[in-house]
Design a protein with these regions (language model features):
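Intrinsically disordered, glycine-rich low-complexity segments
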Residues: 13-14, 25
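Non-catalytic structural scaffold of enzyme domains
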Residues: 24-172
């Protein structure tokens, strides 16, 4: 009887312990930290997506997560536009270190705008922070490069080759 699949996040990728050589059960059960609240709905949506894309057959097979919902985080767009980001970065540092002290193996930040400060935030902690925009590009390119993706469909990789990618953006 094969073990039930267990997925964990690492650099934005999910791994199945049945099919991933070198992944131990301990590694599969690493804790994911989330710096959220910058868009409470974005945090809620991210949490929902992690749960939906975890191959779990019971509650105990889900990823342990610490969600730090910091709705009072200083405005990211204002920090970008004015260059006044000391308070924002101090708060991000506090959050990253809190998640590190709680034993999180990886940190996700569902707020895309926060990734403008990714390098500074990453410098505050030894815990790898998942760079969501880069992972989105990796996801899109996987379909374009692979032709037909050979990735696990449970990871929601593109089923068809990607021929065009649209980009929308703002000043912050």
């Amino acid at each position: 009887m094969s073990a039930a699949p267990v997925r964990f996040a690492s650099g934005g990728r999910g791994y199945d312990t049945r099919n991933c050589v070198g992944v131990t059960k301990e590694a599969a059960m690493e804790k994911l930290g989330v710096i959220g609240g910058m868009g409470a709905e974005a945090t809620s949506y991210y949490y929902d997506q992690v749960v939906r894309h975890t191959a779990a057959t019971c509650d105990q097979e889900h990823i342990d997560m610490v969600v730090l919902s910091k709705s009072t985080m200083p405005d990211r767009t204002l920090a970008i536009k004015t260059g006044e980001h000391a308070e924002l970065l101090a708060t991000m540092k506090e959050c990253a270190r809190a998640l590190e002290s709680l034993g999180c193996a990886h940190i996700a930040i569902p707020c895309n705008t926060s990734h403008y400060f990714y390098d500074q935030i990453q410098s505050f902690t030894k815990v790898p922070i998942i760079h969501m925009p880069r992972e989105s590009v990796r996801y899109a390119l996987a379909g374009a490069v692979m032709g037909e993706c050979e990735f696990d469909p449970n990871l929601s990789m593109p089923a068809e080759p990607v021929h065009k990618i649209g980009i929308m953006g703002t000043d912050g």
